[in-house]
Amino acid sequence: MLGEVPMVRDYDPLTKILHWLVFLLVAAQYAVGELMPHIGRNAQDEGLIAWHISLGAAVMLAIAVALAWRIAHPVPQTQEIALWQRRVATATHWVLYLLILAMTVLGWAATNFRGWPVKLFGVLPLPALASKGDRWAHTAGDIHSLLVNVLLALVAIHVVAALYHHFIARDRVLRRMLP
């Protein structure tokens, strides 16, 4: 029938890998980030800061790849959910992608503000987005911290929606993304 959305069972394997990789990296990044306000200035703290910077660079790389893959390979559509739900899900996913990407760039700038280098996997140095003491970079750090709460709220909505589909609607929405 014209205009009918074909039924697709699962996401492709790379989409699933990227989804769960980004989730794991962001969860680890959040855990390390939560420890950072409570640290002092000793060698052990510098290791924690280095981990946060390295994880941030890894998150940035993973979300950039996921975003490029998503653009090249749109989400498989399904008739299992209403059109309005598909639209809300699509909008939420794009906001999550862009929010995570923005947080990594803002964190990068905030790191430069403190005069610390940003290295991908602790090896490949990335260019500075700002100079040490740059007022914009300080603001970037404040926004970076604020966006953590926005990200947590959106992830909570994402998880609740997935659980709703699995346990209440009893459709395949959640299972399509499971490994």
Set out the residue ranges of the language-model regions.
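Membrane-embedded alpha-helical bundles that constitute the cytochrome b-like, heme-associated redox core
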Residues: 1-179
